[in-house]
């Protein structure tokens, strides 16, 4: 079954790049802006209540998780009220130890058991929304009064319905490129807003 990327593919690189960018524009127009507002408001609330924000993801989404955490933590470090944001995707020793000893499905949930506290926030980033290690981490968080939010694509998978909040990127199945592109831009957008929000407070 063909998806939109298959349909716009052309051996003419100029045409493909033009149509790819046009498809990204279409996706952006169909994202619910209220869900982005909800995420920003939630992150600010967690900071104001001295709570931690944890980002999790696999593959390209792990890179987005790291970038997101970096932007809002390091980007606000010089101000009075920075964000306590952490990516649980970054420590190779921890990830490989947990994966080796407990299985890949446990690499995030076991970190949350060690670090996360009541009313913290876990943000899961996933194109499919079905990664078992993310689902397990979100289930644990929900059961332990840790707030949850997800960025998803495709049909939203399990995460879309499991998390307390969600930003859904409306792509077709297996369109990883556009899904991860838009997730990264959302991360940049949220980070840009939060940095300026903190600047305005100072």
State the predicted function of each range.
Residues 61-201:
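Glycine-rich phosphate-binding loops that contact phosphosugars or nucleotide phosphates
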């Amino acid at each position: 079954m063909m998806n939109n990327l298959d349909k716009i593919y052309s051996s003419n690189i100029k045409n493909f790049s033009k149509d790819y960018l046009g498809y990204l524009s279409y996706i952006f127009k169909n994202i619910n802006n209220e869900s982005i507002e909800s995420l920003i408001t939630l992150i600010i609330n967690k900071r104001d209540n001295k709570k931690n924000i944890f980002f999790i993801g696999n593959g390209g989404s792990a890179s987005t998780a790291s970038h997101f955490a970096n932007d809002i933590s390091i980007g606000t470090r010089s101000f009075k009220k920075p964000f306590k944001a952490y990516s649980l995707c970054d420590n190779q020793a921890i990830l490989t130890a947990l994966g080796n000893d407990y299985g890949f499905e446990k690499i995030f949930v076991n970190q949350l058991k060690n670090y996360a506290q009541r009313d913290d926030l876990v943000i899961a980033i996933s194109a499919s929304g079905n990664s078992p290690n993310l689902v397990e981490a979100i289930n644990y968080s929900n059961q332990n009064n840790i707030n949850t939010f997800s960025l998803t694509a495709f049909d939203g998978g399990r995460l879309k319905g499991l998390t307390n909040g969600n930003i859904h990127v409306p792509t077709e199945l297996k369109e990883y490129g556009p899904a991860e592109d838009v997730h990264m831009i959302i991360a940049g957008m949220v980070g840009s807003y939060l940095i300026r929000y903190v600047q305005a407070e100072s």
